[in-house]
Curated annotation (Swiss-Prot):
Lineage, highest ranks first: Eukaryota, Viridiplantae, Streptophyta, Embryophyta, Tracheophyta
Induction per the UniProt record: Induced by jasmonic acid (JA), abscisic acid (ABA) and salt (NaCl).
Gene name tied to this protein: ChiC
Organism: Arabidopsis thaliana (Mouse-ear cress)
GO BP terms in the entry: chitin catabolic process; polysaccharide catabolic process; response to abscisic acid; response to jasmonic acid; response to salt stress
Free-text function comment from the UniProt entry: Can hydrolyze glycol chitin and chitin oligosaccharides (e.g. N-acetylglucosamine) (GlcNAc)4, (GlcNAc)5 and (GlcNAc)6. Hydrolyzes N-acetylglucosamine oligomers producing dimers from the non-reducing end of the substrates.
A Pfam family of this chain: Glyco_hydro_18
E.C. number(s) listed in UniProt: 3.2.1.14, 3.2.1.200
Pathway: Glycan degradation; chitin degradation
Effect of G99W: Reduced activity toward glycol chitin, but enhanced transglycosylation reaction toward chitin oligosaccharides (GlcNAc)4, (GlcNAc)5 and (GlcNAc)6
Family statement: Belongs to the glycosyl hydrolase 18 family. Chitinase class V subfamily.
Binding site for chitin: G99, Y259, W348
Name of the protein in question: Class V chitinase
Length: 379
């Protein structure tokens, strides 16, 4: 090989490696927004975030293509431009699916090479046409070993497609993320961690909805970071399970809620965690946004309690009891994430915050926390 060709090759390789390194995420401070929250995009303080998710695009079960409903098109098409007014460097991702999406449609799509290609190609087209910097898949949840295998195949093909599209278009590669169960073990069905780690830029660990009146007859911490008994769900247990299964810590993003759940106590004098209840309070399913919780506390003179053992808050007034995360819980979780070497944190959802109070506390806590060597080791 001539010296000229050798130099050219070295330059090309160096450029490629530099490009790949430059695309590696250094931190994720994120939140989701969705139109039904009725929270104006213009009110998002994007200076508090590195990434914002716009939710949700849909999957057409007949064509297996990603679509945006006509009702959402105006807000989705201007989302990136709007949030970048306050923070030109914030990255946006189009989130596909969601908790109420038909999971059987995703299982069917992922089971066939042709339908996977339809999903992948259309997702890239939609992301580019709407000006998003990436894509996020919220399939809740692959529920069998076969579905998990197909999920892994989908992710690998998705990654190959966005790399190829970036090469052909000359544009920066689209980011790829996924919202996943808090643990890598979904009721004895294991996520394909190798495919997840090699294909996605990061995963959002949904470490919340552990307790709620729809599935728990007693009060409990909806998003406990720790469970002293080591028998129940917690953010720490879920994070450890993912990392011990092989997910790099720097691809894990810890999630927490900007909402809580309200129960009606059976006995107003029994108001701690795991107190008996008669069902949901305040709203039909008991869900209540953080801003509404703050108002409830003031309007009712509610007693507030922070539990440092589980890292969670609750308040009560009469027979109304609410479990949630306040500033201290959020800050503690953010510190946990950084000290253990995680990539960052995300919240659901930005519209439920109270004047950006939780988002501001989270961002400041991350910046003020020093990463330590207390990383979670793979076994």
């Amino acid at each position: 090989m001539s010296s000229t060709k050798l130099i050219s090759l070295i330059v090309s390789i160096t450029f490629f490696l530099t490009l790949q390194c430059s695309m590696a995420q250094t931190v994720v401070k994120a939140s989701y927004w969705f139109p039904a929250s009725e929270f104006p995009v213009t009110d998002i303080d994007s200076s508090l975030f590195t990434h914002l998710f716009c939710a949700f695009a849909d999957l057409n079960s007949q064509t297996n293509q990603v679509t945006v409903s006509s009702a959402n098109q105006p807000k989705f098409s201007t989302f990136t431009q709007t949030v970048q007014r306050r923070n030109p460097s914030v990255k946006t991702l189009l989130s596909i699916g969601g908790g109420i999406a038909d999971k059987t449609a995703y299982a069917s799509m992922a089971s066939n090479p042709t339908s996977r290609k339809s999903f992948i190609d259309s997702s890239i087209r939609v992301a580019r046409s709407y000006g998003f910097h990436g894509l996020d898949l919220d399939w809740e949840y692959p529920s069998s070993a076969t579905e998990m295998t197909n999920f892994g195949t989908l992710l690998r093909e998705w990654r190959s497609a966005v790399v190829a599209e970036a090469s052909s278009s000359g544009k920066p590669r689209l980011l790829l993320a996924a919202a996943v169960f808090y643990s890598n073990n979904y009721y004895s069905v294991l996520y394909p961690v190798s495919a997840v780690a090699s294909s996605l830029d990061w995963v959002n660990l949904m470490a919340y909805d552990f307790y709620g009146p729809g599935w728990s007859r007693v009060t409990g911490p909806p998003a406990a970071l720790f469970d002293p008994s080591n028998a129940g769900p917690s953010g720490d247990a879920g994070t450890r399970s993912w990392i011990q299964a092989g997910l790099p810590a720097k691809k894990a993003v810890l999630g927490f809620p900007y909402y809580g759940y309200a129960w009606r106590l059976t006995n107003a004098n029994s108001h701690s965690y795991y107190a008996p209840t008669t069902g949901a309070a305040i709203s039909p399913d008991g869900s209540i946004g953080y801003g509404q919780i703050r108002k409830f506390i003031v309007d009712n003179g509610a007693t507030t309690v922070y539990n440092s053992t589980v890292v969670g808050d609750y308040c009560y007034a009469g027979t109304n009891w609410i479990g949630y995360d306040d500033n201290q819980s959020i800050v503690t979780k953010v510190r946990y994430a950084k000290q253990r070497g995680l990539l960052g944190y995300f919240s659901w959802h930005v519209g439920a915050d109270d004047n950006s109070g939780l988002s501001r506390a989270a961002s400041q806590a991350w910046d003020a926390t020093t990463a330590t060597t207390r990383t979670i080791q793979k076994v």
